[in-house]
């Protein structure tokens, strides 16, 4: 039998009493949705310490789309050529980043293990399935640190829009919004957001006791951030909750200008397009 989210020390090794209490409160509310699955950050304390250092460093770095201005690229390429089976056959005499051959989904579908670095312990690998925009599912290997480092770039983008995650006051830091007949949902905490809650919710009525519970749940818990793809966020916009998050993060597919304009009018907060 799986542990309740507020007692899930396997997926959240550093879960403390305050984080546990937050999760129990959010899951046990009368208007709460169905939480069908479980998930967590899986980070050990030394990895959280390293993440904090990485985030502080990244915050002060300039962002550039020019390969020559990103000093991390050459060391990263060197590691790939040395330790990732797929890249070991690449021509190591290539000088420019732009001259390396690209890959596509067919490369990933043939042998995904060829993209796992030799030195990574297999018991820390996360495998997840994604269909992208093609509808053809792929199993992708990842690692808890990879998932966690997204937070550093999200924080940086939020700061560009004058949103400081260190000033969040709600016990619910982030809602990841979905809208599907069947959806992976869970309650977790985010150690890189002061151990505040992170909820993946499905706003399809199937996952709620009553459609009105969706509005009541958001207004009661007041999430600081809401993230989702343009489709799920559009569906969410039609729910008449009054709460205004500090920012909306749009992911996974192109955010059209007209849709962005609708979000800005509806939410009255920065809309961050993390995909287009």
Which residues fall in each region the model found?
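Short glycine-enriched loops at secondary-structure junctions
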Residues: 124, 179-183, 231-233
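Short, well-ordered, mixed-charge alpha-helical segments that flank or form enzyme active sites
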Residues: 148-149, 181-187, 235-236
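Glycine-rich, histidine-containing beta strand-loop boundary motifs that form or position
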Residues: 141-144, 178, 229-230, 275
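Nucleotide 5′-phosphate-binding alpha/beta core
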Residues: 1-129, 135-167, 225-227
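Active-site glycine/GP-rich loop and adjacent strand/helix microenvironment
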Residues: 1-63, 193-276
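Conserved AMP-binding loop of ANL adenylate-forming enzymes
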Residues: 161-196, 201-204
């Amino acid at each position: 039998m799986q542990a309740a989210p507020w007692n899930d020390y396997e997926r959240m090794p550093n879960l403390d009493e305050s984080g546990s209490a937050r999760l129990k409160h959010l899951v046990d509310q009368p208007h709460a949705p169905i939480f069908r699955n479980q998930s967590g950050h899986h980070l050990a304390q030394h990895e959280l310490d390293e993440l904090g250092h990485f985030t502080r460093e990244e915050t002060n770095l300039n962002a550039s789309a020019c390969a020559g201005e990103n000093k991390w690229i050459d060391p990263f390429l060197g590691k790939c050529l040395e330790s990732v089976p797929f890249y070991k056959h690449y021509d190591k005499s290539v000088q420019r980043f732009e001259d390396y051959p690209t890959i596509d989904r067919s490369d990933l579908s043939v042998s995904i293990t060829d993209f796992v670095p030799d030195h990574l312990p297999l018991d820390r690998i996360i495998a997840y399935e994604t269909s992208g925009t093609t509808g053809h599912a792929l199993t992708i290997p990842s690692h808890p640190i990879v998932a966690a480092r997204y937070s550093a770039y999200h924080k940086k983008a939020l700061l560009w829009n004058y949103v400081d995650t260190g000033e969040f006051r709600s016990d619910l830091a982030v809602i990841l919004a979905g809208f599907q007949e069947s959806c992976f949902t869970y309650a977790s905490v985010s150690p890189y957001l002061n151990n505040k809650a992170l909820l993946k919710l499905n706003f399809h009525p199937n996952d709620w006791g009553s459609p009105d519970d969706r509005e009541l749940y958001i207004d009661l818990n007041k999430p600081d951030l809401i993230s989702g793809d343009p489709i799920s966020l559009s569906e969410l916009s039609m729910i008449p909750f009054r709460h205004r998050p500090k920012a909306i993060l749009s992911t996974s597919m192109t955010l059209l200008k007209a849709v962005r304009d609708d979000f800005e009018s509806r939410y009255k907060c920065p809309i961050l397009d993390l995909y287009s």
